Amino acid sequence: MENNPYNMRNLPQIMRSARKAAGLSQYQIGKLIGGKDQRYVSDVENGLAKLTPELCIKWFEKCAAYEHIDLVHYLFKLHPTAAAPIDPALNECASNAVINMVHQLEEALQATKHLARWLTDNRPGKTEELPMADIKQIFDLIAANKTLIYSLVRTHGLKMQELADRWTRKALVDQVAMAKQEGRQAVSV
């Protein structure tokens, strides 16, 4: 992206700010990210150490700066759907996040109906532009979901890893999770 408002060069300062906001010393964050010394942490924060996605994610996780993990995904292009992170100020109030989620769900439902109609009308050989406004509206659910989850972590102590583990167990039981490698190979043989 040519006009990216985020710059990788700013990541060390963002890491320093997140550490300070979490009330951690350089010594404390060093221990939390894998037994690193204060000098190493200082080098990271001054842009003298090579930043990896793993280091940045671990750092921001220890600082409970979840939006910053989204920033890492975006800056390092770790996933095609990685987008600009949500402003942390929007993730402070769970009731506002629920209201936003309901609003986004309603709009996404309409957009999904429009998309379904577009797909039904689409015929072989007929070239028509994708309905990007509708697809974007559906994409907005990703941010709305993160806003709700992050706000529940901050205001009600939701444990994200526990939620992810529960979802994974249920998805495996319901057979909607990605099959293990052996299963995929067996199907393709």
Curated annotation (Swiss-Prot):
Residues 15-72 form the HTH cro/C1-type domain. It holds the Pfam family HTH_3. The keyword Cytoplasm does not apply. Keywords: DNA-binding, Transcription, Transcription regulation. PROSITE patterns: HTH_CROC1. It comes from the Bacteria. Residues 26-45 bind DNA. It comes from Bacillus subtilis (strain 168). This is Uncharacterized HTH-type transcriptional regulator YqaG. The gene is yqaG. One of its GO terms (molecular function) is DNA binding. Gene3D superfamilies: lambda repressor-like DNA-binding domains. The keyword Nucleotidyltransferase does not apply.
